[in-house]
Structure formats: C-alpha cells, structure tokens
Swiss-Prot record:
Record's function text: Catalyzes the attachment of threonine to tRNA(Thr) in a two-step reaction: L-threonine is first activated by ATP to form Thr-AMP and then transferred to the acceptor end of tRNA(Thr). Also edits incorrectly charged L-seryl-tRNA(Thr).
Positions of Zn(2+) binding: C338, H389, H519
Official protein name in the record: Threonine--tRNA ligase
Gene3D superfamilies for the chain: 3.10.20.30, 3.30.54.20, Anticodon-binding domain, Bira Bifunctional Protein, Domain 2, Threonyl-trna Synthetase, Chain A, domain 2
Family the UniProt entry places it in: Belongs to the class-II aminoacyl-tRNA synthetase family.
Organism: Porphyromonas gingivalis (strain ATCC 33277 / DSM 20709 / CIP 103683 / JCM 12257 / NCTC 11834 / 2561)
The protein's assembly and partners: Homodimer.
Domain TGS: from-to ranges: 1-61
Enzyme class: ligase
A cellular component annotation (GO) from this entry: cytoplasm
Length: 653
C-alpha cells in the first residue's frame, strides 16, 4: 500500500499503481467527472499515469491553472492531428498552452499557406476528432528511437529539438494516428474538448530567430462546455472595443511612425497630459514616503552593464553598442536603470544612520524586440519605467517592503483596480546552490515578504523556485473590467547588485556592511500601464486624470465668442477645457465628443449667453440642467478635490 496525502493534510492508503483518475473516483463521482490533471509531489501528471510510491497529491479541475494548461495543451495536439490529416507532409515546431488558449507553429510546406479563411475547416476537423474520444497515450522511448521516428517523417524541427535533449528516455504522446514529442501532461482523451475556436494566423520565426525560417502560428482556444466558449467570444468582442490601440487613436493619445521606427511610441499632446499626470501623481506619493528624484543618461558604458550582469542577460535583446570613433569606447542604450542608481549610491560615503536611501526615476530604457512581437504600447522597444531603488539595512527590509506595498495599494485604489492578487516568489526548496547571498539573508528576506503580506492582509500565492537568483520578490496581478489578469507592480529584493558594485555603508560597529537593495516599479512601465488603464476604463478616465475635463459646444457660430469666454474662465481655475467651434449641428458635436470620452459638455446658445450660464451634460448620464459658470466650476473642483483627497488621505495617515 502507498500513502496519498492531500492538500488539507488528510491522507488515504491505496494500492501501488493507483492513478489520479482512480483517486478522484474514490472521493466522489462528480470530482472524477470534473478532474483534468493531477499534481504529484509538485509535478503535474496525466490522470492515468500510475503512482507507485507515497506522494502528496492535488487534483486539478478547470478552475485551476494547471487544469486549463493540460486542457489547452491537449487542444494544441488535437489541432496538430487535424492539420496532419488536412495537410499531408506538414512539419511541426512547438505547440504550447498559453495564458488564454494555445498555438502551434507549423511549416505547411513549399508553396502552401494557411490563412484565416482556412481556420473553419481545421476547426471542423478538430471537432470530428474530438467526438471520437481518442485515448491520449503517454510513452517513454529511447532518444535514438525518437530521432528515428521523427527523422522518418522528415520533421526536421522535432529532430532538432530531440537532438538537444540529454541522452536517455524521451516522452511522446499519441492520439489516433498522430504522435508528438511532448513532456505532457494531457487529458485522458480528446472527448473532453467540447468547444473549439481557432482565432488567428500569424508568422513566427523558428525558435524566435529572425535568421531562421518563418513558420505559420495558429492560435486557438477551447472549453469543456459550449456556453463557456460563447461567453469568451462575447468577452473577446468587448475587448476589441476596448483595444488601447483603437481608443488611443480615437482619443489622440499616442501614435507610431515608421519614419521614427517600429516600437517607438510618439506621445501626442493629450496622451502626454495623461502620462504627466500619472507621473506627478506618483511623485507626490513618493515625496511623502521620502524618495529622492534622480535623472540618469539614456546610454551607459558597456562595462557598466557587464558589471551589473545585464549585458549577459539582455545582450541579445539590446541594440548594438555605439562606438566612439576616437576613444574606441562602447556605449549601450540603457536596458535598465538600476546600475546607474548603484553608481549614484557609491558617489557618497554612507553611515548606517543615512539608510534607507530611496532613489526614484522615470527612466527610459531600450530593448530590442522582434517586429512580430511588437504590440501597441504593451510591447515596445523604448519604454519608461517608474523605477525606484531602495538601499537599506537588513533590519529595515520588512518596514521598507511594507511601505512600497502601501504605495501600490494607493495607486490601485486611485485608479479603480479593485481586484488584484499577489504572488510571492521564493527559492527552490531543494536546489539552494543556484542562489547568491547568505542563508541568513535569504531567510530574513523571505520571512519579511511573507510577514509583510500577512500584516497588510494581502492574500498571496507562494511559488517555490520562482525567485530570481539574487533575491525573492512579490508580484501584483490586477484584474481589469473584463476580468483579464495583468501583471502590474513588482517589488524585488536584491543581494546581487550590492555585491557586483561593491556597495557598502559603515555600520554601528564602525565596520563596512553591504546594504540590501529593493527594486520597485508600481506601474511597471508607463507605456504598458497606460495601455492597461485605457482598456480597463474603456478610455473613460477619472476626472482628475483625464486630458480634457470639459468641452464647450456653441450651438452656432454666433455664440463662439461666448464659448471661448466660458473656456477662458474655466481655464483660469485650472479646469482643462476645449471649445468645439466647428460649423456643425450641436447634435453632431455631442455625438463626436461622447466618442472622445470627455466627462462634461457645456452647451451654450442664446439663453445661456444672455444669462451668463451653461447647459451641462455629463458623459454617460445626460442632461444635468442649467448652471452659472461659477457653480459648474465649483462642481468640477469639488469632484476632483474629493478624488484627490481620498488617495492623499491614504498615504498621509
């Protein structure tokens, strides 16, 4: 008999060779119906894989990320099986599960292309194969046999992948007449897949290398129920309406120019106003928390990034070094701000009394992204991080960590991100040798993060083995208005850079000590954060943040002068206002400015100009009646003051 321990600490004994499927059935028929994969001692297994020794077991359903992963991974194989039947001789690259669905990179063959118009036929074949409920079989075979198998099919991509694996056994999965190289896990059979939608076709270079062949990437998604697919497709349609690229163009926030270069956004006047207000908002909070603003160059000597380790990590993702013709020095576009901040810390000797030192910068950094990977503001080649680096004593780590968490909470509240969760990334429990820093420092840092989350009442998932080699971290994932998860806000403890840059302070014992470094970026990057904010709000920004708070609409040209007088009076009270004095009917002006998401519209005509009044319309609410100009101005000022006071109160308490 073997002992199976469950997540709640309870255990049962079973015959050796029991499977996750059998364990689920021993608990309840409903669980056996819903379970998709099994966690065995921290690894995700197929449900029908035998368990032959004592183990900790967790059963994963659709609501678990591991369950979805197995489901979508099997769906990728189902698509590959359909493609092999429809396109004889097709070659396969990789086909993973991703956050929302799956894809497969394929080479259809010389002169053959797969386009969006072909997706319905592929989808139909997948549905037919799923209906057969083909058993998915896992096999362990020798590496030589795997090379022979895929070599006989002339599948050079699989042969290349297998050649790079260590000698020994290779895992394959078979369903029907299709076999694929794969670690798994997978569903028991294809019948679990009830609803399928292939979404799009794109190009992708083999192994991400622009010098290699461009393959065809087919994206799809699948569900265990048709109703789930219908709901997802509705969500997808709403997401298209909220696409930050579409709204950014409509609101004239940002643009791209091929003459400037792909992945290099141009911030237009209205977008610049929005971004600067976000920056000012964070600067006010940082000032309260004792941060000092710094500015560093856009380039740095290559040796700086060799010292920091960023050249080794980001060298392939960086633009080529800039060579000075006379001195022969090499400079790089800055890939990260932290090495520069370390150099600022080193300029002045520090005592233990000086710490913590908090350096903040809206610093622009540059990474080379392949053109096919660029996407609006969320994936660019030049972006500005709301970066800060804190240098503190080990005994100050927890307190400083809590304060950074407070800053992130204030930002999320002010911008209406109500639903968020956190992940604590800690060391691998077993392989400790791959981490730098003393055991004592690591334990202190990990304990500080866990206790900080407990003190703040923040539920957090702990992931072992996810920490960087130089320290543990806390990541925040927010859910937007459509329920999509975005990673926003990171707090990272770092023992590496203080060592690399030989940072030190004089302790109370008059000896030299290493500071602990904290990296933090609540927004992450301004570009990506603005993209998420646009899609979360559908471009309807809070009144304190929106580029234009008011637009004045004269009903005819006769009242343009009065409209500009109203605008001038509001401008004098720091209310952001525009005048739409186009020679158009007022109904057209109202519709156009509704699309621009301007919160308030003031309509002025004969009566309003005579009485020194305005007719007020609020975005999404309609007519608010006639008001004196001063009354309306006071209404705006109070609404903004109430919003600002709410988040100021949070950090002043």
């Amino acid at each position: 008999m073997i002992k199976i321990t469950f997540p709640d600490g309870n255990f049962r004994e079973y015959e050796a060779g029991i499977t996750g499927w059998d364990i689920a059935g021993s608990i309840s028929p409903r669980l056996q119906q819903d379970v998709l994969a099994a966690g065995v001692n921290g690894q995700v297994w197929d449900l029908h894989r035998p368990i032959n020794e004592d183990a900790e077991v967790k059963l994963f359903k659709w609501d678990d990320a591991e369950g979805k992963h197995a489901f979508w991974h099997s769906s990728a194989h189902l698509m590959a099986e359909a493609l092999e039947e429809l396109y004889p001789g097709i070659k396969f690259g990789i086909g993973p599960a991703i956050e929302n669905g799956f894809y497969y990179d394929v080479d259809p063959g010389e002169g053959i292309s797969i386009k969006d118009a072909d997706l319905p036929a592929i989808e139909k074949r997948m549905q037919d194969l799923a209906a057969r409920k083909e058993t998915i079989i896992r096999r362990d075979i020798a590496k030589a046999d795997a090379l022979r198998m895929f070599g006989d099919k002339d599948d050079q991509y699989k042969v290349e992948l297998i050649s790079e694996l260590a000698d020994g056994t290779i895992t394959t999965y078979t369903q029907g007449g299709f076999t694929d190289l794969c670690r798994g896990p997978h569903l028991p059979n294809t019948g679990y897949i009830k609803a399928i939608k292939l979404l799009s076709v794109a190009g992708a270079y083999w192994r991400g290398d622009e010098k290699r062949k461009q393959l065809t990437r087919i994206y799809g998604i699948s569900f265990p129920k048709k109703k789930m697919l219908d709901e997802y497709l509705e969500l997808l349609e709403e997401a298209k309406k909220r696409d930050h690229r579409k709204i950014g163009k409509e609101l004239e926030l940002f643009a791209f120019s091929q003459n400037v270069g792909a992945g290099l956004p141009l911030w237009l006047p209205r977008g610049t106003q929005l971004r600067l207000r976000l920056e000012d908002f964070l600067k006010q909070i940082q000032k309260h928390f004792g941060y000092q603003q710094v500015i560093t160059p856009h380039i740095g000597n290559k040796n700086l990034y060799i010292t920091s380790g960023h050249y080794a990590k980001y060298g392939q993702d960086s633009f080529r070094p800039i060579n000075t013709p006379q001195e022969g020095e090499e400079f790089m576009l800055k890939p990260m701000n932290c090495p520069h901040h370390c150099e600022i810390f080193k300029i002045t000797p520090h005592s233990y009394r000086d710490l913590p030192i908090r350096l903040a910068e809206f610093g622009t950094v540059y990474r080379y992204e392949q053109s096919g990977e660029l996407h609006g503001l969320t994936r660019v080649r030049g972006f500005t991080q709301d970066d800060a680096h804190l240098f503190c004593r080990p005994d100050q780590l927890k307190e400083e960590f809590c304060k950074v968490m407070d800053i992130i909470f204030i930002i999320f509240k002010a911008l209406d991100f109500k639903n968020f969760e956190a992940q604590i990334s800690l060391r691998d429990k077993v392989n400790r040798e791959k981490y730098i820093g003393s055991e004592e420092n690591w334990e202190r840092a990990e304990r500080a993060i866990i206790e900080a989350c407990e003190e703040k009442g923040l539920p957090a998932v702990i992931e072992y083995g996810e920490a960087a080699f130089y320290g543990p971290k806390l990541d925040f994932m927010v859910k937007d208005a459509l329920g999509r998860r975005w990673q926003l806000g990171t707090i990272q403890v770092d023992y590496n850079l203080p060592e690399r840059f030989d940072l030190e302070y004089t302790g109370e014992d008059n000896k030299k000590h290493r500071p602990v470094m904290i990296h933090r970026a609540p927004f992450g990057s301004m570009e990506r954060f603005v993209a998420v904010l646009i899609e979360h709000t559908a471009g309807k920004f809070p009144l304190w943040l929106t580029p234009d708070q008011v637009v004045v609409l004269p009903v005819s040209e006769r009242f343009n002068e009065y409209a500009h007088r109203v605008a001038k009076e509001l401008n004098q009270r720091d209310i952001r206002v525009q005048v739409d004095d186009r020679n158009e009917k007022v109904g057209r002006k109202i519709r156009d400015n509704e699309l621009k998401r301007i919160p308030y519209m003031l309509i002025v005509g004969e009566n309003e100009s005579r009485e020194e009044e305005v007719s007020v319309r609020k975005q999404g609410e309609g007519d608010m009646g006639i008001m004196k100009i001063t009354t309306f101005a006071e209404l705006i000022e109070k609404e903004v003051d109430d919003m600002i006071s709410a988040w100021r109160k949070d950090y002043q308490n």
